[in-house]
């Protein structure tokens, strides 16, 4: 049986917005920046570090919190645009190709912020995280172990889903699409991590942000389900 060509609107024909090299450089820059600020600067330039961060620096904690919130918003942005693409609402705004590019961009930059969010905590003296506690889920027993692990697992799933775009041709469109369903788990885990482990979750603006973004994702998800259920099925081929 000859191979069937995919429809022209299938995402398997879309190329990544960034090359693999550019994506790798972005992630390496996030890792290097966090490690330089948390480890190298205090060791090699303690005077400069103290002048920037103070004698008892809480700047690392503030940087981790702000990077975490930014990473969450980028994840939400990516998930929302992914749902807009699958619902075909993106045709109205901002257009299919632009929506795909924004979806990829937000995902990749979100990973970079997630890396910075975790690794910058190496400089925090209050929690005194080790590298292994930051990279291994349930590795920390001092601060909300389960709640922190939700974010760690969500990050790894997010990285797998995002970077799968670069191996889409190897794993096949069907496997790539199935892997993308993990985005719902990613968003749920990261949202739970932010609400349960984040010290800013008690602030009213942050609560409004979580409720608003969560409601939008929920609406787009139900809209996708309803449109898929009501979509006419292709007629079965007649057999001789």
Where are these regions (language model features)?
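Membrane-embedded alpha-helical bundles that constitute the cytochrome b-like, heme-associated redox core
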Residues: 1-240
């Amino acid at each position: 049986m000859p191979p069937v060509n995919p429809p022209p609107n299938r995402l398997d024909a879309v190329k990544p917005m960034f090359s693999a090299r550019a994506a790798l450089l972005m992630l390496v820059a996030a890792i290097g920046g966090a490690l330089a600020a948390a480890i190298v600067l205090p060791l090699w330039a303690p005077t400069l570090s103290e002048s920037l961060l103070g004698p008892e620096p809480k700047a690392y904690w503030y940087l981790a919190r702000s990077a975490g919130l930014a990473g969450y918003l980028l994840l939400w942005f990516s998930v929302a645009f992914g749902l807009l693409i699958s619902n075909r609402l993106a045709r109205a705004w901002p257009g299919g190709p632009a929506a795909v590019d924004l979806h990829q961009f937000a995902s990749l930059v979100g990973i970079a912020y997630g890396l910075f969010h975790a690794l910058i905590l190496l400089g925090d003296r209050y929690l005194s995280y080790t590298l292994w506690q930051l990279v291994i889920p349930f590795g920390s027993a001092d601060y909300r172990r389960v709640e922190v692990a939700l974010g760690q697992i969500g990050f790894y799933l997010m990285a797998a889903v995002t970077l799968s775009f670069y191996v889409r041709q190897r794993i096949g469109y069907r496997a790539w699409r199935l892997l993308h369903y993990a985005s719902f788990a990613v968003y749920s885990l990261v949202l739970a991590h932010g609400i349960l482990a984040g010290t800013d979750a008690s602030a009213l603006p942050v609560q409004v942000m979580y409720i608003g973004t969560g409601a939008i994702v929920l609406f787009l998800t139900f809209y996708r389900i309803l449109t898929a259920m009501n979509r006419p099925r292709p007629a079965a081929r007649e057999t001789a």
